[in-house]
Amino acid sequence: MPSLRKRVKIQAENAEPKDECSFFSELSSGSEEDNKEDSIWEPQKKVPRNRRQPASKGSKRKQGPRAKKSSQQVDDESKDVAVKEELNSPVAIVDADLEEKSHKLQTTKTLKTAAKKQKKPVPRAKKRLKVDEETSQASPLEGGGSNVETPSTSACGNVCKKEESEDSFTFGQSPVKRIRTESCPQGRPARVPDGVSDIKEEVEMNWDVVQVLSERTNIEPWVCANIIRLFNDDNTIPFIVRYRKELINNLDADFLREVRQTLDELRDVAKKVHSRIQKIKKEGKMSECLLQALLNCKTFEELEHVSAPYKMGSKGTKAQRAKQLGLEGAAWTLLENPGQLNLLSYIKPDVKGLSELNDIETGVQHILADMIAKDKDTLDFIRGLCKHRYICIQSSLAKVSSKKVNEKEVDKFQLYQNFSCNIRTIHHHQILAINRGENLKILTVKVNISDGVKNEFCRWCIQNRWRPRGFARPELMKILHNSLDDSFKRLIVPLLCREFRAKLTSDAEKQSVMMFGQNLRQLLLTSPVPGRTLMGVDPGYKHGCKLAIISPTSQILHTDVVYLHCGQGFREAEKIKRLLLHFNCRTVVIGNGTACRETEAYFADLIMKNYFAPLDVVYCIVSEAGASIYSVSPEANKEMPGLDPNLRSAVSIARRVQDPLAELVKFDPKHIGVGMYQHDVSQTLLKATLDSVVEECVSFVGVDINICSEVLLRHIAGLNANRAKNIIEWREKNGPFINREQLKKVKGLGPKSFQQCAGFVRINQDYIRTFCSSQHTDSSGQSQETAMVTNEKLGKKKNKADATLIPNPLDQTCIHPESYDIAVRFLSFIGGTMCEIGKPEMQQKINVSLGKEGIEETAERLQTTVHTLQVIIDGLSQPKTFDIRTDFDKPDFKRSIVCLEDLQVGTVLTGKVENATLFGVFVDIGVGKAGLIPIRFITEAKLSKTKRRRSLGLGPGEKVEVKVLNVDIPRSRISLDLLRVL
């Protein structure tokens, strides 16, 4: 901190009350020699954060006579060129006369610099980056093509601001952000969308949103800036992840969601700050220092701490009541000139609070304590101090818990009844468990800050920040010591505890929601089992087991109810066998709900006896979470009218194996039932994350626009329920879509929506050819074919050129329409044709071309980025039937069953991950009870390279090989060790 500044002597003993925060910018540490000296001092002006000082009126530039034009001078328009000031650059107010005399010299030097740069251009990529409209409007030199910058008004003396090359600018204002690659260690420019302006938040604060976002998410500032711009431009996460990788440094969707959540939090804080500012202004309590303190707030806890004294209350704070008694001047005098302070002069026997000297000392103490607790430098010091000291969170059994809460509920929190852990090492699931116990009045939680923190804090305050300006009598130093102690215990410690608890809870909730999203992604991307006739079984006791047989195309073939657990098992077995043989069904899908274990044992026994011969029947267990909710929903009633809701559940269970993604998107993802503490976290955050994960999965898998359902279509990036409905109506009215461009004709689908969704909708070319050929055989002849291919009636304003629509083979790939011209040039470069898309010949030509010339050189030749070219290569080489879900695991089909009593320690088994939490992974090993792999046994070495990524960790559906560590039969608990991922 800077050295202490000496303060002006106070002539009067009863000094006028000053601004309560004006002292904050002046107090700082000082040497012992300053106490002996009593010289007059002058307060220094507070330096702004951006270090820019506006020029005074007298220093404005005087316009002299215009110089004659020459080949080395700028034309008249060049005076309007805007120069982007660099952050933290030295600032000086230029004298008007000096500036006028040196103006011509500055311009001449600038022109010479520009001329030299034109002679020695920096070799860069062939495709130059575009600057925004402000830079493009600057007039070029008459003799050259580069823009000329006028001398910066903030430059010191005759030093001219260094001119940057055109390639060094992104968005037209800030320096270009670079991405490091192996072939280009210094980084290559990240291309940005045209027309993107600088980041301007709706609500301005004293902190930079990009910098704070980077600090909280641990992501590079330039990446955060690009992400903010992309989100401000209404881009969706799937679109950004696939088609804007170069702007986000190849981050995955989980990181983008984290950035968006943090950004929303910061914006919510900013909005609440300005709302609180307006409220305080209306009450007439606003001061400049309070305004700056509010604008410095970055969290809700800081905002509440700063604005708490100004809330409407009956009594106000202790400091406010002391100020109303006129003791604020005494507090300032104690700090600035303690030798002139006489507390006896404040005694007024007839005024409560001023009648005794002890009351006056207490009032001054409260004012000083409030000043200390509101000082930014003091809070920054104590926060930094806590980062390097032992701070623990403790939980214990509440005294009244045994009287009001059930004993079974208390036993659930046995681990936390005498619990203590460092806040830097505590696990997220422990925080959520402690919070739940506290909310249920079972646990008492507190944060313990060691005494060493208090001692060092008080020592720093006395010796540095809050050191009096001059000699202070012992009784005054006692007041100051009491103020520090009171401020620390009563104000600062509660604030720190709230901040620690809020940070721990926020991080734990985010991790819990992220884990829920990862589990949901694994379920949605479970590999489908197409081409099979399936029997879905919804188990039950009294009301029987509901059966539903569906065709390979998900059509309902038969529904029935059988009573397997009511003494009629043998007779019902004949019915089941008859149904399986009649529909040639070899796969049974059993829901994991009530009576699942008994139903599984029933089918396993029949299969082991070869009862269904000649059919080789297998079965699998799937989660039926959400099936009952969906069965009574309007969507289910519309899809399966007239069918009993109980039978709809059986249909849904069967379809979850045939096409999990298409079935699971039909209901709210929070009902799927994978995750941890989902009811304890923010429901808004949970819903936003799960909806985003569903959108991500559906978009990356892609949909066939001509056959997909409305429910699936509404989850595509850029679409919603209304747009999906309009697309279906357009398809029913005009026939199938011939190419992606026709999406622009759908009502409510503007350019932005088309940009976001176009790359994720596919148009099957075989389906289009079949449709067109069917029109040839129609009795109406060629005229009807043309009418159907156009997909709309010709109006008066329609051109004949619009009547004929030509299918585009690129519409069946993941290539975005904005890259079609690059894809065509790439095909020409490798000697390929549209007919070879998705065939082995295309892959061979791509490999030969990239073998001769690497992908980076090819990207430069095509004037595009490596990421865009990679998407084009993937789209051209992937087979027409490519599905990203084929890389994920399929359901585990079984023929036999194992009991819990059969397990032995050391037995090696294979199983399927059922759920993943922050403390471990639950694995279904076929014994009716899932075993737990503690998180300490899931090491990076046991995971494959593809599973080490943050978004592809162990999740539901993963097949693993485990070893039994412990079997607790009375408690039905199984401990497992992960051997490897299958």
UniProtKB/Swiss-Prot annotation:
GO terms for biological process: nucleobase-containing compound metabolic process. This is S1 RNA-binding domain-containing protein 1. One of its GO terms (molecular function) is RNA binding. Residues 256-283 form a coiled coil. Residues 1-153 are annotated as: Disordered. Keywords: Coiled coil, Isopeptide bond, Phosphoprotein, RNA-binding, Ubl conjugation. The gene is Srbd1. Residues 906-979 form the S1 motif domain. Residues 46-69, 114-129 have a biased composition (Basic residues). It comes from Mus musculus (Mouse).
